[in-house]
Amino acid sequence: MEVALTKSALLVLEDGTVFTGTAIGADGLSVGEVVFNTSMTGYQEILTDPSYSRQIVTLTYPHIGNTGTNNEDVESNGVHACGLIIRDLPLIASSFRNQQNLSDYLKANNVVGIADIDTRKLTRILREKGAQAGCIMAGADLDEVKALAAAKAFPGLKGMDLAKEVTTDKAYPWRKGSWRLVGGLPADTPAEALKYKVVAYDYGVKQNILRMLVDRGCDVTVVPAKTPASEVLAMNPDGVFLSNGPGDPEPCDYAIEAIQQILKTDTPIFGICLGHQLLALASGAKTLKMKFGHHGANHPVSNIEKGNVMITSQNHGFAADEATLPANIKVTHKSLFDGSLQGIHLTDKPAFSFQGHPEASPGPNDAAPLFDHFIELIEHYRQNAK
């Protein structure tokens, strides 16, 4: 299906930089933190990742939208990125799985987007000055002054608890495994065929994380972010998972307190992304806001224990501060881009976490064995509990 683009759009950063381009989504105005992602593929997974809440995503790869969109390559029930910035939208979306071109997909989800701007220049600005607020305005009556005022009024993500905004309203079971080339997404796995009972805190969970847990025999119950530890422990889980999510981890007092209560037991804990940061905070460490964060599918990470390198998918603007880690936490992984902390393991509890995204979507599968380590801890816990 050919895409027809006729409307204008503009992007204004809080430092006053203005880009003019073509509207590729809904009309209107969108304000958020502008970040850049270096992934070549997976734009639909990126858009539907709840971790991008209140963020406008710049995709550095020049051609975005080649394969259109479909109803399977999603990480949540809707689009969470509040805006999209790309260099070029191909006129034709071509894939045997394509159901809707990217522009129409953005319109259907009321997402404002802009194309035909110099994304290399924009990325350099974000690298040099750091992630900053921005405003995309699309449609008629474009107003640079109004857009700049809107960008400057954005409060920023530091101090912002977004997990409570994107979490589920009520608990639900998840028993669906990973997508397959033959058959697509499978039907739910029967509960009796799943060996391990895992409770997953939803701080903005990606569905592929849940799929990979099911692939390893986990009967997953997803619970709201503010679920007390007492309710989780009353379910007698074999393990507790702490999900990814958006925003600053430090304001999430409810999550930190719940994790601290669970840590008093010997229940295995596995955290990813925001869950990693929350585990660090619950253990006594601190977190910090990064200059422009890590967003991409090609980030090298050192596995300290094994002495090898993993290529990983990353999406975070905050990080656990290694200098503040208590004595009972050992560092397991570090970024080879900037040396930032990527993984931790408690020495006195069966709890560990990883800053990147071992479930990928998009990205490589080098870090997928972290899910297997979670299962190993669960097996050990079950044996000791007998």
Curated annotation (Swiss-Prot):
Residue span of region CPSase: 1-196
Keyword Amino-acid biosynthesis listed: yes
Gene Ontology biological-process annotations: 'de novo' pyrimidine nucleobase biosynthetic process; 'de novo' UMP biosynthetic process; glutamine metabolic process; L-arginine biosynthetic process
PROSITE patterns assigned to the protein according to its UniProt record, in alphabetical order: GATASE_TYPE_1 (PS51273)
GO cellular component: carbamoyl-phosphate synthase complex; cytoplasm
Entry EC number(s): 6.3.5.5
Binding site for L-glutamine: 51, 245, 247, 274, 277, 315, 317-318
Stored HAMAP family: CPSase_S_chain
Domain called Glutamine amidotransferase type-1: residue spans: 197-384
Keywords for this protein: Amino-acid biosynthesis, Arginine biosynthesis, ATP-binding, Glutamine amidotransferase, Ligase, Nucleotide-binding, Pyrimidine biosynthesis
Pathway entry: Amino-acid biosynthesis; L-arginine biosynthesis; carbamoyl phosphate from bicarbonate: step 1/1; Pyrimidine metabolism; UMP biosynthesis via de novo pathway; (S)-dihydroorotate from bicarbonate: step 1/3
Native source species: Shewanella oneidensis (strain ATCC 700550 / JCM 31522 / CIP 106686 / LMG 19005 / NCIMB 14063 / MR-1)
Catalytic activity reported: hydrogencarbonate + L-glutamine + 2 ATP + H2O = carbamoyl phosphate + L-glutamate + 2 ADP + phosphate + 2 H(+)
KW Nuclease (keyword) present: no
Top-level taxonomy: Bacteria, Pseudomonadati, Pseudomonadota, Gammaproteobacteria, Alteromonadales
Protein name: Carbamoyl phosphate synthase small chain
Family: Belongs to the CarA family.
